[in-house]
Amino acid sequence: MTNILAIETSSVYCSIGLAKNKEIYIEHSQEENTHGKNIFGFIDNLLKKSQLEKEEIDFIALSVGPGSFTGLRAGCSVAQGLAFGLQKKILPLSSLRVLAQTVFLEHKAKELFIVKEAHMNDLYVGKFIRKNNDLALPLIKDAAIKKTELSDFISSDNKEVICSNCHEFLDYLIKPNLLKINNHAKGLLHLACYLNDLDTKLKNPEEVYPTYLSGTDQWKRTK
């Protein structure tokens, strides 16, 4: 049996989850940009609800980006601090994959094209397919593109288009299969619960960093 703490702060909303064996507990903010205000309180609330001690957490699942710079730094700092203090490892996962996983848990889509606002005229994009256990499997590497390049990525073959924090920009697509959704800890927890089926493995806290993508210089910071 495994106890997993999930920290999802890659969007404007703070979303924290805890899996105690097969029981799932979630704390999700409805206020934007309140990561610093809520993250520790959310974790404490989840530990109380689940009747777990911090020391009983087996590992921490972390959404590492791409996404909100401030949110990613906050989530990563907290995850690293807890992991160091508890001598636990971290499972770093793409925030685009977490978003796709959240959709697969709520909708019957088989294939997704993810679009997420990156600011500075850039968008983050990714493609995912539903596999065994409803897991989101990436079809391409996460990328940052210019908004003007979006038409090169979206085609009539895309079964579903998912957007996060870019609703007004994507409204012009007028696609019947356009869904608007944000990252949620339940998607992160679902992926983490199938750790053995993922291509990403547990890492020591000093090996985990936020992932930033830029369409301007294609810079990616990962270790």
Positions of predicted regions on the chain:
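Phosphate/pyrophosphate-binding loops at sites that engage ATP/ADP/AMP, CoA/4′-phosphopantetheine
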Residues: 43-59, 152-159
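DPxDG-like acidic metal-binding loop motif
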Residues: 59-95
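Short, well-ordered amphipathic alpha-helical segments that serve as non-catalytic structural scaffolds
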Residues: 35-50, 96
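Oxyanion-binding and handling regions
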Residues: 1-23, 32-34, 91-223
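Short amphipathic alpha-helical face segments that pack within enzyme cores
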Residues: 38-41, 77, 81, 98, ...
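Residues at secondary-structure transition points
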Residues: 30-38, 69, 73, 77, ...
